[in-house]
């Protein structure tokens, strides 16, 4: 479903993100008592009175200051208003009307977007009415007192909001594919997001840490809707101070956890760092599908063999993700960026894939014929009775054996490699569970499930 959009607009530190969290009943927007925490525009879904919509949180809008990221934030706010069905101007009731509020109100009056004024920080109902009355001078209609922290007045505000929203007239019942863009600071994640979307959705800067939140973007490619999450860069813990970056990194880790597929971005010039390896380990631990994107490939001097040498070197350090597809791109020029969706979709499909027990056992039987299970010094040999896939996301197989201790790491890796060679599963981790089974219990299960035993005692 393509939802109507509400753009949250206002000066820095008037409580926009707190109000977003209140209206969406979530904590996804980073809230910190410091101006400029929100920089890019971020999206969350919400519903009220049986009507669904999405809210876009924007950075603090300042017209008369071009320092730091303020010009880029202005661009993000302008883009948010262009796509919005409704603007919600948030002001600070305790501070009263400021020159900044008047400038924003003038800009909104000149736009074609309907605007509702929310007077925040009105903790008392009686006092709130008095505080809100001053904001009639903005010329945007009746001001509405609310408290984002305590929730008072937000129900009435939402009633007004849904009354102004258009009907949802575009529907798509297909499931959205969640794809997170993961990487160290300044490897080009936001540039990649902008290249993918064909517009400036995230602020791009040479300064590390430009993205402090996780940015959700919904786009359609082919027959699929993709929800793309650009995350904050993840640095060493000792370099992370408590505050916006701390919260942003937590959001980034949560983005991995809720993703169908992760795009791990590596800097082609810098190569793989310790932090890249930790991110790779995190993706593997969470069992997520993944593709490795080597960005800034346009900056590398190369000949006909460079790509093979670089891939070999990178894979030797990203051994956690030996099963991931690796592609070399330039987010700046757009080189091979479109290939990301093809490989990401394949990884998602493999991550969700199921294989019948008969096919699994055909592969195991052939694998054993090429290389028998090891024999211990005591003369006891491992026996692999049969295997079956027990779940997907990621694909998980249970292999029933006489004694798991008889199967060392080398043979276990051999079996996983054979499963991949014969069945694919590129782009997704595999989990193999080795389970010991007594002969009596095995016979009952084999008879009940009509399974052919690969090896007998």
Swiss-Prot record:
> Which residues are in the EngA-type G domain?
4-169, 177-352
Residues at which GTP 2 binds: 183-190, 230-234, 295-298
Domain named KH-like is located at: 353-438
Q: Which UniProt keywords apply?
A: GTP-binding, Nucleotide-binding, Repeat, Ribosome biogenesis
Q: What Gene Ontology terms for biological process does this UniProt record contain?
A: ribosome biogenesis
Q: Which domain of life is it from?
A: Bacteria
Give the binding site residues for GTP 1: 10-17, 57-61, 120-123
Q: Which CDD domains does the record cross-reference, listed alphabetically?
A: EngA1, EngA2
Subunit structure and binding partners: Associates with the 50S ribosomal subunit.
Q: What does this protein do?
A: GTPase that plays an essential role in the late steps of ribosome biogenesis.
Its protein name is GTPase Der
Source species, please? Prochlorococcus marinus (strain MIT 9215)
